Design a protein with these regions (language model features):
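Membrane-proximal, proline-rich intrinsically disordered regions
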Residues: 1-58, 62-65, 92-97, 446-448, ...
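Conserved, well-structured interaction surfaces
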Residues: 51-131, 135-151, 155-170, 346-349, ...
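Internal, well-ordered domain-core segments that constitute the primary functional module
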Residues: 151-153, 158-225
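Hydrophobic-face positions in mid-chain alpha helices that act as interaction patches
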Residues: 208-363, 368-369, 374-424, 428, ...
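C-terminal functional modules
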Residues: 386-497
Length: 497
């Protein structure tokens, strides 16, 4: 009779491979999302701005419990599944015909995804649960020191790379939505992540030697082209469409437009203010603005992909002139350029964790920081920009023309190396808000103007979730005191200057 009470359609256990692919999608979904309740990094970095609901464009991250949703997505949906996948695969007995290295490769790849995810948590919050995290029997985990977590992640990363062997297999094609089980690609990903971590901690005095080793060891083995990009391609049908498509197209909403900050940087121009549009008695920069005819200096070739040509702000010239909204202000959707169709309207548009362009910028940074990887800063700067332009659909000719502009050329562009690399990296990281934010914190470039009605300076971390403050109060208090206060202005340990 007991057999009659067993639901044969309810699996007793889930294969580790299924949990891994689920965790991959959850991670990429969170990093790619434009949902204002969980991911507002594009708004913080003034790549986009809001039309009507302007709280987040003015740096209010508390009202919608954004930190909680970011925290939950990474801990509950990503790390928990990765940990369970690791345990199941590790404990699965091999058949006599199976290659043990295939299993080792799977475990190492899971480790790489875990390390990436924890680095995002540390870079967002600082001290976070780590050594006691993911234990269902411990509802009050301690928060580990952020620097100590990074040191352990570095050790784990080196071990994972040592354990990968591209002469053996790993996940099947349908169990790995990023590299389809290609171990050689995962080795490049691991080294590219290692390079990123090395650059991230390069200004921390106690980690300077470690940073140099990370960079020098990884540099020969990182991404070599856009074919190596760590990207997840979505499907054309729900529920596996790109979350941007869900938020911008399926929803029918008109919540976001490009921000004037990035528009004006990619297409410099002069403005004039003709009317007192906000009726405050004066005509100034708070009013609606018009592009001075013929004042455009140059146009970044990526603009036709980043933005829609629904609005020509200067019909007097042949080239389309784009117009961005004021960060933090109310911006009427029809009056401004829109998000590009490739991004907003393609349900299968891929989302990226790390790409070749970013890696090339990191190598340029390494050289400027005095670390002797092979090449020059200018060469890697040019490679990074070219890779970005080609990725979006531009041509080599367009890239060369752009790089020869006085304002863009590495030898003639204004500012020091941080300004040159930081500004161009910010442009190349368009639509990748978190990565852009992290780079901006390290390089302090470009200089972002204050939004219309800011509640703070530009946030350099998320505050801890309110639920943590309530339910895990002692650990929360210890962490807040340790980092110097639970504020959006408290720097992460590596954010030195």
């Amino acid at each position: 009779m007991e057999e009659l009470n067993v639901n044969i359609k309810d699996p007793v256990s889930v294969p580790g491979e299924a949990l891994f692919v689920s965790a991959q999608k959850s991670l990429v979904d969170q990093m790619a999302s434009t949902n204002v309740n969980s991911n507002v990094f594009r708004l913080i970095m003034q790549q986009w701005t809001a039309t009507t609901y302007t709280d987040e464009s003015n740096y209010d991250i508390v009202t919608r419990t954004i930190p909680q949703n970011h925290w939950d997505a990474l801990y509950k949906d990503v790390l928990t599944d990765l940990a369970e996948a690791y345990t199941i695969i590790e404990n699965t007995e091999l058949l006599t015909t199976e290659d043990p290295q295939t299993k080792s490769n799977k475990l190492a790849i899971i480790e790489l995804m875990t390390i990436y995810t924890y680095s995002v948590l540390v870079d967002t919050f600082g001290n976070v649960p780590y050594s006691e995290a993911l234990d269902i029997d411990n509802l009050l985990p301690k928060y580990d020191d952020a620097l100590t977590i990074y040191q352990d992640l570095i050790n784990r990363l080196n071990t994972a790379l040592d354990n990968l062997d591209d002469t053996s297999g790993s996940f099947t094609t349908d169990s790995d939505n990023i590299y389809q089980g290609n171990v050689s690609k995962w080795i490049k990903f691991g080294n590219s992540l290692k390079l990123r971590i090395g650059i991230t901690v390069s200004e921390v005095p106690s980690l300077s030697a470690v940073a140099q080793s990370l960079i020098l060891e990884s540099a020969p083995n990182v991404f070599e082209s856009n074919d190596d990009n760590a990207a997840l391609s979505y499907l054309s049908s729900t529920p596996n469409t790109n979350p941007i498509y869900v938020d911008l197209t399926l929803s029918g909403r008109q919540d976001f437009i490009p921000a004037s900050t990035i528009i004006d940087n990619m297409q410099p121009r002069a403005y004039e203010f003709l009317t007192d549009s906000n009726e405050d008695g004066t005509i100034d920069e708070s009013d609606n603005k018009t592009v001075v005819p013929g004042s455009v200096t140059y146009t970044d070739p990526r603009m036709k992909f980043y933005f829609d040509d629904n609005l020509d702000a200067d019909p007097s010239i042949e080239q389309i002139v784009y117009l961005g909204g004021t960060p933090g202000a109310s911006n009427a959707y029809p009056n401004y350029s829109h998000i590009g169709e490739m991004i907003a309207s393609d349900p299968s548009f891929e989302a990226i964790l790390i790409d070749y362009s970013e890696v090339s910028f990191l190598l340029a940074e390494a050289i400027e920081r005095g670390i002797n990887v092979s090449g020059t800063a200018e060469e890697f700067y040019n490679s990074a920009i070219t890779a970005s332009i080609l990725y979006w659909g531009g041509t080599t000719e367009e890239a060369n023309t752009y790089l020869n502009l006085t304002d863009i050329s590495y030898t003639s562009a204004s500012g020091d190396w941080k300004e040159k690399i930081g500004t161009q990296k910010w442009i190349a990281l368009y639509n990748r808000g978190f990565s852009s934010w992290n780079s901006w914190k390290l390089l302090d470039q470009p200089i972002l103007p204050s939004p219309a009605d800011p509640v703070s300076d530009t946030p350099i971390r998320y505050t801890y979730p309110i639920v943590e403050q309530t339910l895990n109060g002692d650990s929360y208090s210890d962490a807040a005191n340790s980092i110097g206060g639970d504020n959006v202005s408290t720097p992460i340990f590596w954010d030195i200057n």
